[in-house]
């Protein structure tokens, strides 16, 4: 009996250079063992839909939606944090941090969200937010992890936190509606990721 390695990897499959680099690393790591590589979202859609037709929306650090119809995969979104990822935890955190700055400036009233961010980021003065973000050095996972604060504020009916969630839900719904055009009969929708 010989095991086969099957891996679902973030970002695998879209760019040839990345695919080749990952394949080379896996050949070195697995030696003569047989292996197959797929994108993490391909594994997710297969698992979530049990190999059937439907749509899977993933909203974690980033966001993407995929539809599977007759074994054909179509994607929508998944453009990365610099170009899109609407509705993702990173996107939510970015909106939150912008609101923090607007609340400090006086453009918006200060709400619980403001105080949660100030406490979590250990800001002595409001301008320290710039240093805090710069120290994260564009680490999207660390920035995305701040989105939890939006959930805390939303549970207490913070109007800005609730608005961010409404906008995120709208963006995720647009991903689903775009892919729904591929179907003429009822279909399954599944969701995966920390935003949910």
For each feature predicted by the language model, list its residue ranges.
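Phosphate-binding/catalytic loop of phosphoryl-transfer enzymes
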Residues: 13-110
